[in-house]
Amino acid sequence: MHELVIKGGRVALDDGWAECDIGIDDGRIAAIGNGLTGRALLDSGGRWVMPGGIDAHCHLDQPVWGGAGNADDFESGTISAAFGGTTCIVPFGMPGPDMTTIGAVDRALDRSTGRAVIDYGLHAVVTMGTGPDVEAQLTELAGRGIASVKLFMTYQGFAVDDDLFFRVLDTAHSLGWIVMVHAENDAAIRRTRQRLIDLGRTDIRYHVVAHSETMEREATHRALAFAEMTGARMTIVHVSSWQSAEEVARARVRGVDAIAETCPQYLFIGSADLDRPALDAARFVFSPPPRSPRSHEHLWQALIDGGIDLWSSDHSPYWFADKIGGSQTPAFNTTLSGIPGIETRLPLLFSEGLLTARLTLGRYLDLTSRNAASIYGLADRKGRIAVGLDADLALWDPTARWTLGHKALHSRVDFTPYEGKSVTGKPTTVLVRGVPVVADGQLQVQPGFGQFVERTAANPDLSGKPVEETTPWLDS
């Protein structure tokens, strides 16, 4: 007899749907089958039992860089994630000014402990200011359950030069880590922004001009060329454009271990939204910016055929007054870049991808949990409904029709770019390690229930080997 049995559900298994029970013991899935008995029963009532989602790209409680702080901390952010069907997140140990990479991770651990309601890991981040001993810092963090690092190719204070880029790639490769890259050409962005400002063209719609598809494509190509030279495994985060998606596809043909991530805003928000009146248009400012219908169509096809591997939120939460700097006529160059999305990530794809049969069940599971688990070193515990893994589950009502709006969501952010959008399908019960975190529309656990998850190297066969044994550009 199991501690808990979920009965009567349509269960999303690796090989398809099954009408079966799930037995849970000690927080893990102990059995999958029919006729299971348990000391406690959870009747799914015909709901769809899905793996809990994994969001491997979100921002919570980050240091302030001369602007506004995040509206969501690890408590409110993980509560919002849970109500959206997500059971594990991997945000960033983002450095503040004059903060080392290790110091940034320590800060994030300190501010998350006792606050999260779902499980979480952390990505490291390297900038030009995070210390000269980057190799030693990343190696130390590898022993503390970190298995990935992010680099920026733009943003003042964050963008790395080519030398540091290569040093991080070599180190990450030798550790078996994956490198996440924000790919936009910094010099082109700064040059174009200043020209637009000099010409007085600062309406919100010029955000697309200042962050063009060409700028994203060029940086994507260059980052993947660096990965090709070093043998490093690389995720291009928030792919927004058909051009960048094609760069990833070309790199794969050349043998680059290239992973592509996109986000809901690149399918459900378009560049035309920036043509709205300024206060309305400001809700849609994020970087890279929303793109054309051509990119929407291309990215949908990439979701379908495997060109895109990851569906992440890039949740970047600001209160709206902070986002627009208190201005009633916000400009593209003064509006903070970033939108909330940690709770709407799964409902949007469930409604518009899975229920419409645009996506197969397998592709939906790959995009929302399975790939993130395997890519980011969580597959030994999370990402699938399988015996031995954590009982991280979301029971979805596939008939529930509801309207997205910031008052219906659980983030502290006071706006959503999806205000008024109707979706079908809603997670009604969410379990983390077999414990209901959300049920009957209410939070069921206290802050601190969520645990930090130590991750393993995504490519452990390389871990611990010297760089000269693992780097292609030294083979010639």
Give the positions of each predicted feature.
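Divalent metal-coordination and catalytic microenvironments
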Residues: 9, 27, 46, 57, ...
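Alpha-helix-loop-beta-strand connector modules within alpha/beta enzyme cores
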Residues: 102-118, 167-181
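Histidine-rich, glycine-flanked metal-binding segment
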Residues: 1-52, 66
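C-terminal cap of metal-dependent C-N hydrolases
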Residues: 324-331, 387-454
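Active-site mouth loops of central-metabolism enzymes
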Residues: 58-72, 93-95, 121-134, 209-213
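Metal-associated gating/positioning segment near the N- to mid-region
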Residues: 44-115
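His/Asp/Glu-enriched, well-ordered alpha-helical/loop segment
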Residues: 202-233, 309-310, 317-399
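Histidine/acidic residue-rich metal-binding segments in metalloenzymes
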Residues: 135-311
